[in-house]
Amino acid sequence: MNLKEKLFPENRLGLNRFWNFSRGGIDNFRTGLRDAVSGVEQTRSRMMEYDQLLVWAILSLMLIGLVMVYSASITLADGPKYANYSSNFFLIRHMISLAIAIGVGIWAFKIPTKVWDRYSPVIFGITVLLLIAVLIPGVGRGVNGAKRWIPLGLMNFQSSELMKFAAVIFAASYTVQRQEYLHSFVKGMLPMGIAVALVGGLLMAEPDMGAFVVVALIAFGILFLGGINAKLFGGLIAVGLMSGATMIAFSPLRRGRMLAFMDPWQVDNAANKGYQLTHSLMAFGRGEWFGTGLGGSVEKLHYLPEAHTDFIMAVIGEELGFVGVVVMIFLFYWIVRRAFLIGRTALQLDRSFAGLAAKGVAIWIGWQAFINMGVNLGLLPTKGLTLPLVSYGGSGILMNAVAMAMLLRIDFENRILMRGGKL
């Protein structure tokens, strides 16, 4: 002890108090820092439980769809068909549909994949009954000569959209259960062929050939990925092509659409069956590289029918240009790519149903987007298919959200298993 400490003992006491306080402060700081870092790691761990980029791609398409639906529909109230509606009518309805879809999607994400597997036959059967109900007078609602909707208050539910989802889970479950019979026509191919033919007959009675094409692609695409006999699959493709050609040949409406598709600029076609296609092509032409800007479309001013639904891609091409179209294609490519990768991972983890269901979602979204874009660009004959996650339509948005939720759930379960966890 030095002289100063002997003469002023209170200073020593003060120094000890200061040291104890400082040391306690440092310890508290370290504890707080450790807790903060632990919290960040836990948050990061929770964030890694799902594919963030996939979620952002889905939300981006929904947001672009909301903006473009508003842009494409804002002038519809000026026409006689929607004269009693406000200019914001379709925007508000689409916002409600998105809110319902996201809410249902969050709920669907909580459903384990094995539940979809267990109840897939029940869901498929209920959906078939709904397709029958649409055709019953007084139950189904007709629009533009087609009976495809069941009025449910906030939205007109389209049973064919539910059938696309039902086809994914039913075909995946069927393929897993019939794995040993996939090389047999009678026990492997025929039962699924009968189911698809039944659904096809109901959809063609509405009529909704576009939905039937998508359902058939989903069902037989999953069978192909599940390991069906190559010769049987080749025969199936041949039968499908011949059936399609027969339907076109014996249907004046479809035959006229095919002729208009082959030469849309012919005078009679341009004013009738090829009217939508020619104006869609003009919309893309006006858009050039960077588009005319949001709200700058001319074709949506009562020239291009169904600009906010089937032909929304043409409005995107006109207002956002080639760059906007490329962005849309990339977003769909990313979703389809991730869905196939998630499915492959599930199969590597011996989760056959989950893997095939994920790939079924990829087939659904990929083919429907391809067909819609192909129709808008004049690469395919006109079909009444919307652009997934983008076009106006409550049923389509709802079932797309459920499919995306199931896909994210499969990815979530994959990550749990890869970390050594249990489902």
Swiss-Prot record:
Domain of life of the organism encoding this protein: Bacteria
Cytoplasmic domain ranges by topology: 1-53, 110-119, 171-184, 230-231, 332-359, 408-423
UniProt keyword terms in alphabetical order: Cell cycle, Cell division, Cell inner membrane, Cell membrane, Cell shape, Cell wall biogenesis/degradation, Glycosyltransferase, Membrane, Peptidoglycan synthesis, Transferase, Transmembrane, Transmembrane helix
Pfam families according to UniProt: FTSW_RODA_SPOVE
Catalysed conversion reaction: [GlcNAc-(1->4)-Mur2Ac(oyl-L-Ala-gamma-D-Glu-L-Lys-D-Ala-D-Ala)](n)-di-trans,octa-cis-undecaprenyl diphosphate + beta-D-GlcNAc-(1->4)-Mur2Ac(oyl-L-Ala-gamma-D-Glu-L-Lys-D-Ala-D-Ala)-di-trans,octa-cis-undecaprenyl diphosphate = [GlcNAc-(1->4)-Mur2Ac(oyl-L-Ala-gamma-D-Glu-L-Lys-D-Ala-D-Ala)](n+1)-di-trans,octa-cis-undecaprenyl diphosphate + di-trans,octa-cis-undecaprenyl diphosphate + H(+)
Residue intervals annotated with topology Periplasmic: 75-88, 141-149, 206-208, 253-310, 381-386
Leader sequence segment: none
GO molecular function: lipid-linked peptidoglycan transporter activity; peptidoglycan glycosyltransferase activity
Broad EC category: transferase
Biological or metabolic pathway of the protein: Cell wall biogenesis; peptidoglycan biosynthesis
GO annotation, cellular component aspect: cell division site; plasma membrane
A biological process term (GO) from this entry: regulation of cell shape
Topological type in the membrane: Multi-pass membrane protein
Assigned EC number: 2.4.99.28
Transmembrane spans: 54-74, 89-109, 120-140, 150-170, 185-205, 209-229, 232-252, 311-331, 360-380, 387-407
InterPro entries the UniProt entry points to: FtsW, FtsW/RodA
Localisation: Cell inner membrane
Protein family per UniProt: Belongs to the SEDS family. FtsW subfamily.
Cited function: Peptidoglycan polymerase that is essential for cell division.
Name under which the protein is recorded: Probable peptidoglycan glycosyltransferase FtsW
Organism from which the protein derives: Polynucleobacter necessarius subsp. necessarius (strain STIR1)
